[in-house]
């Protein structure tokens, strides 16, 4: 008999069929307590779990005594209790490589749209304000040859640095847990402490996962150290930034503009002050949101679960020592 798995995110038909070729697949709408209670027998027998955007915590794991692996359709896994999974010897798989280039594209789009005020001036045109040749109140700022500070030089940071260095001749500063020799050799990137990066960068791009150490890493103190002309970009995780401090920095003119793909609470509240600011470009966590990349992520997650339940954890595993 095939192992039983629970799918809590819709898949394209071909990927669902791939999953069904290996497992008995039970589809549920979400992982809410109500759903778990209504499908208690299914959860009790499931050996695998696949989906995204739901919390997987110790309380859920108590209801899934046979669970051996969970696969998320994402690179981030801050919604998983990794300690609880590891304590129960449950593998956690994710999709770290599939979305790199697409998220870097999104970051570069935020850099360009904030600097050149693309969203703001497009709305002014639609509102009928373009009635004569434009003047300085429509102007943006250059991107080329401006200094880009990258906080978090992982795969996505490297892909962004490549675009900025070769495409826009931007000097690159970076801050990370360790020196990145390849970034320094390929892009002439310069490692520096966070304070130096904040003080010298024209654009500050935050690309960090959410951990206990990175929560609210950016607050009033950090924004106060940035140039008043600086543009701040966040496409990592929303809670890495103290959103109230960001709002205050924008309102006080401590920084110039923000381009945001992630927020402390998602979806962003309709009454958030960020939505009424002309100097904010806010998009709904679209970092990896292309048809091609989302399909690739789903395919990777399916293959990850198949591999994990077959004892193959050579790649894409957050806690591979569980398999030892």
Curated annotation (Swiss-Prot):
Recorded hits in Pfam families, A to Z, give: 2-Hacid_dh, 2-Hacid_dh_C
Query: What keywords would UniProt list here?
Result: Cytoplasm, NAD, NADP, Oxidoreductase
Instruction: Give this protein's Gene Ontology molecular function annotations.
Output: glyoxylate reductase (NADPH) activity; hydroxypyruvate reductase (NADH) activity; hydroxypyruvate reductase (NADPH) activity; NAD binding
Origin superkingdom:
Bacteria
EC id:
1.1.1.79, 1.1.1.81
One cellular component term from this protein's GO annotations in UniProt: cytosol
- SUPFAM superfamilies xref list: Formate/glycerate dehydrogenase catalytic domain-like, NAD(P)-binding Rossmann-fold domains
How is the subunit organization of this protein annotated in UniProt? Homodimer.
| Function as written in the Swiss-Prot or TrEMBL entry | Catalyzes the NADPH-dependent reduction of glyoxylate and hydroxypyruvate into glycolate and glycerate, respectively.
Q: What is this protein called?
A: Glyoxylate/hydroxypyruvate reductase B
């Amino acid at each position: 008999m095939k192992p039983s798995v629970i799918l809590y995110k819709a898949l394209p038909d071909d990927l669902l069929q791939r999953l069904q070729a290996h497992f008995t697949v039970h589809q549920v709408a979400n992982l809410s307590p109500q759903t778990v209670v209504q499908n208690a027998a299914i959860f009790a027998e499931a050996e695998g779990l696949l989906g995204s955007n739901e919390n997987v915590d110790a309380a859920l794991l108590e209801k899934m005594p046979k669970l051996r692996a969970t696969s998320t359709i994402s690179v981030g896994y801050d919604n998983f209790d990794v300690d609880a999974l590891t304590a129960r010897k449950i593998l956690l798989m994710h999709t770290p490589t599939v979305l790199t280039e697409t998220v870097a594209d999104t970051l570069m789009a935020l850099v360009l749209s904030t600097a050149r005020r693309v969203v703001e001036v497009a709305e002014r045109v639609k509102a009928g304000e373009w009635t004569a040749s434009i003047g300085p109140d429509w102007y943006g700022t250059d991107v080329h040859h401006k200094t880009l500070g990258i906080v978090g030089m992982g795969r996505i940071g490297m892909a962004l640095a490549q675009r900025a260095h070769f495409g826009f001749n931007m000097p690159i500063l970076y801050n990370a847990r360790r020196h990145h020799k390849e970034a320094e050799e390929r892009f002439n990137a310069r490692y520096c402490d966070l304070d130096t990066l904040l003080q010298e960068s024209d654009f500050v791009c935050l690309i960090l996962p959410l951990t206990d150490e990175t929560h609210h890493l950016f607050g009033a103190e950090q924004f106060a150290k940035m140039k008043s002309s600086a543009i701040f970009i966040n496409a990592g995780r929303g809670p890495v930034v103290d959103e109230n401090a960001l709002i205050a920095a924008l309102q006080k003119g401590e920084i110039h503009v923000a381009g945001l793909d992630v927020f402390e609470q998602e979806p962003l509240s309709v009454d958030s002050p960020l939505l009424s600011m002309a100097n904010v470009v806010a998009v709904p966590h679209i970092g990896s949101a292309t048809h091609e990349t989302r399909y690739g992520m789903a395919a990777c997650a399916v293959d990850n679960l198949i591999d994990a339940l077959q004892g193959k954890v050579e790649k894409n595993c957050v806690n591979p020592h569980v398999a030892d």
